[in-house]
Structure formats: structure tokens, C-alpha cells
């Protein structure tokens, strides 16, 4: 039941869909859902759609920072792409590893970024630490 609520809640957010293993355990399903949300957030960041990216921030984070305050804090000029690779989850927290492709002074490289996501009111949210 809880898994169904989590899946329905996450899949309804920002048009995100993700394949779910029919025989997978609950941890695998939650991990897939969180990775999909993290990818959707990075897709919005890459498109410089800060209003969409802002909506992935936890309700507590959004209560402390407006969308107007968030927009100038994000500098995506060096990003060339990002792939959410995995989520390691425990209870109501996940650590997501995102591989970010960058171009800085003519040098291309990929660097891992660790993000924290939390479960709040049945939905997974990004914890903004900027």
C-alpha cells in the first residue's frame, strides 16, 4: 500500500515516468523512482528551466527560499549534461549519485555529484544545500 502511494505520488510529479521492475523489491522500486526524479530535476537545470527545477526542492526548502531567490543561485553555464546513476536509500532519505558532464576552459570532464533526497508527505524531494 505504501509503495503504491509513493509510486503514484512520484510518478505524478513533473510528468516523470520510470519503468518499474515487476519482481523487484520495494527498495529497488523506491531507488528507481528517486533516480527518475533526480534526472528530471537535472534535465530542467540543463534546460535552464529554474522554475521547474525549483519545484523539486523540498517543501521546507521552498518555505525558506523563493523561486526568485533560487534562480540566480544556479549557474549552469559549465554543464553539458547529467545522468542520475543510482540512489542508495534508507527509510525516508536517499543519497543520489549524479554524473555531471562539464566543459571548463575547453576541458571536458565528468564529475560525480552527491544529492540528498527526502520523503515528505508521500513524495521524494531534493534537499537544497546552496
Language model region names:
Residues 46, 50-67:
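Short, solvent-exposed secondary-structure junction/capping segments
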Residues 33-36, 40, 52, 65, ...:
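Extracytoplasmic/secreted proteins, especially bacterial periplasmic and envelope-associated proteins
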Residues 53-55, 82, 127-128:
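Short, hydrophobic secondary-structure boundary micro-motifs
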Residues 14-46:
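Short, low-complexity N-terminal intrinsically disordered segments enriched in polar/charged residues
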Residues 71-114:
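Surface-exposed, charged secondary-structure patches
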Residues 1-14:
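Sec-dependent bacterial lipoprotein signal peptides
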Residues 109-130:
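Short beta-strand edge/turn micro-motifs at domain boundaries
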Amino acid at each position: 500500500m505504501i509503495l503504491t502511494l509513493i509510486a503514484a505520488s512520484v510518478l505524478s510529479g513533473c510528468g516523470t515516468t520510470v519503468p518499474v521492475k515487476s519482481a523487484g523489491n520495494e527498495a529497488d522500486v523506491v531507488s528507481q523512482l528517486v533516480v527518475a526524479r533526480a534526472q528530471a530535476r537535472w534535465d530542467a537545470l540543463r534546460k535552464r528551466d529554474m522554475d521547474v527545477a525549483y519545484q523539486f526542492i523540498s517543501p521546507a526548502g521552498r518555505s525558506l527560499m523563493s523561486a526568485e531567490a533560487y534562480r540566480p543561485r544556479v549557474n549552469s553555464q559549465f554543464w553539458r549534461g547529467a545522468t542520475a546513476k543510482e540512489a542508495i536509500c534508507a527509510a525516508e532519505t536517499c543519497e543520489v549519485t549524479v554524473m555531471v558532464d562539464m566543459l571548463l576552459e575547453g576541458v571536458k570532464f565528468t564529475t560525480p555529484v552527491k544529492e540528498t533526497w527526502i520523503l515528505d508527505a508521500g513524495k521524494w524531494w531534493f534537499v537544497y544545500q546552496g
